């Protein structure tokens, strides 16, 4: 039996689970009921289940093959976002202010479908398949925390995962090698000037003016400090300063992010930002501090893993379903796994205007064409089987 033969059989199963999870979202590190539901369903399949009882969220399922061998993990993230859903379909979020607006409901459903297929094909599995249902991806710290649970990560030899992607037409799959998603870091800038009366600016050092100048000058980091052949995004997302209409504020704080693909350039980027921040403030008689927090490294696919994934997609779904897609600037904490184990992170197309699947990830009207998810389940299952067979 091949996973392609089970796609139609489990199509409704995978769709139903995606819609169940969509209706019952839980935020990062609060996925308690989600974890219980996943554990119960996996146990009903005869899968060995290990729940992170210390945190109460996240679990590892293990499918033992008919023959001994190495171990590979298939990963799905399970957390939702603090978004008020504006969709009107009957499986919209039942929880006020919480929504699966990124697609993790689809990821869980895909992995449950893969588990169903794998348990039906144990005779083809030469080793162990770990099913990693990871909490708190949206925090950026979910993966490194989850890696410590039950020593599971030390027991595996490779890993595979993916993300449903709204920019890719439904049914297409992208598995290219190399950088696929960007590193994500947070920047905080604190400006200190001198508070004063709104009618006497000459006696103050206006933190709003300083902050505004910093924002404008930071644009030159990308345009004049980075090669045009490299990719860097620098965004300031918020500015907070002052509280009264007639008072010149003496302090301001800004928050933002940088995204990039080349880890070797990170120090250069940070020092360029720091130089602009500090020296712009000095030009106005103020001071400014840059606080830099690394969230996730870039997601970089192993060449051999991607080559295998291409063969699996073609063999399982047909060559017409394999798509080339440009790397993207959002970050993904799956990158932490790929820093230590060979693996592949795939993009799964879900865009379909006929079902309203056109809104971007994190939008309050985000949805997906979930009719294609069982095909992704088949790719997950076949990748695990193929990898174990080729790495005896």
Go through each PLM region and give its residues.
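Acidic/His- and Gly-rich active-site-bordering loop/insert found
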Residues: 1-100, 109-125
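Hydrophobic beta-strand positions in extracellular immunoglobulin-like domains
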Residues: 63, 191-193, 258
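Metal-dependent amide/peptide-bond hydrolase catalytic core
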Residues: 212-392
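Hydrophobic face of alpha-helices
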Residues: 14, 32-39, 111, 208, ...
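Divalent metal-coordination and catalytic microenvironments
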Residues: 21, 61, 74, 104, ...
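Non-cysteine beta-strand/loop elements that form the S-adenosyl-L-methionine
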Residues: 73-75, 187, 345-350
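Histidine/acidic-residue-rich, glycine-tolerant segments that coordinate divalent metal ions
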Residues: 59, 81-83, 87-99, 105-106, ...
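Active-site beta-loop-alpha junctions enriched in small/polar residues
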Residues: 26, 77-79, 136-138, 165, ...
């Amino acid at each position: 039996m091949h996973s392609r033969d089970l796609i139609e059989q489990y199509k409704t199963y995978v769709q139903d689970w995606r819609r169940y999870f969509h209706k019952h979202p839980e935020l990062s590190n609060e996925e308690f009921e989600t974890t219980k539901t996943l554990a119960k369903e996996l146990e009903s399949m005869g899968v060995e289940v290990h729940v992170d009882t210390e945190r109460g969220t996240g679990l590892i399922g293990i499918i033992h093959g008919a023959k001994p061998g190495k171990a590979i993990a298939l990963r799905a993230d399970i957390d939702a976002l603090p978004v008020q859903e504006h969709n009107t379909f009957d499986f919209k979020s039942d929880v006020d202010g919480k929504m699966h607006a990124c697609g993790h409901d689809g990821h869980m459903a895909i992995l449950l479908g893969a588990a169903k297929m794998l348990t039906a094909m144990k005779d083809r599995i030469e080793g162990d398949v770990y099913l990693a249902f990871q909490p708190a991806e949206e925090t950026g710290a979910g993966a490194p925390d989850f890696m410590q649970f039950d020593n599971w990560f030390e027991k595996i030899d490779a890993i595979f995962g993916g993300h449903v992607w709204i920019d890719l037409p439904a049914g297409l799959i992208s598995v290219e090698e190399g950088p696929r998603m960007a590193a994500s870091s947070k920047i905080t800038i604190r400006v200190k000037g001198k508070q004063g009366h709104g009618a006497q600016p000459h006696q103050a050092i206006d933190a709003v003016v300083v902050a505004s100048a910093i924002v404008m000058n930071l644009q030159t980091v990308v345009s004049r400090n980075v090669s045009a052949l490299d990719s860097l995004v620098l965004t300031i997302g918020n500015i907070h300063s002052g509280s009264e209409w007639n008072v010149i504020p003496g302090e301001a704080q800004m928050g933002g992010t940088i995204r990039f693909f080349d880890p070797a350039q990170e120090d250069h980027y940070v020092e360029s930002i720091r130089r602009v921040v500090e020296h712009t403030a000095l030009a106005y008689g103020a001071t400014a501090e840059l606080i830099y927090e690394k969230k996730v490294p870039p997601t970089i696919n192993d060449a051999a893993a991607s080559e295998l994934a291409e063969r699996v997609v073609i063999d399982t779904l047909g060559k017409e379903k394999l798509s080339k897609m440009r790397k993207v600037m959002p970050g993904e904490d799956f990158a932490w796994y790929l820093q230590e184990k060979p693996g592949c992170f795939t993009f799964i197309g879900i865009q379909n205007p006929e079902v309203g699947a056109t809104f971007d990830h994190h939008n309050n009207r985000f949805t997906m064409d979930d009719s294609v998810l069982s095909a992704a389940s088949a790719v997950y299952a076949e990748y695990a089987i193929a990898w174990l067979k080729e790495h005896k």
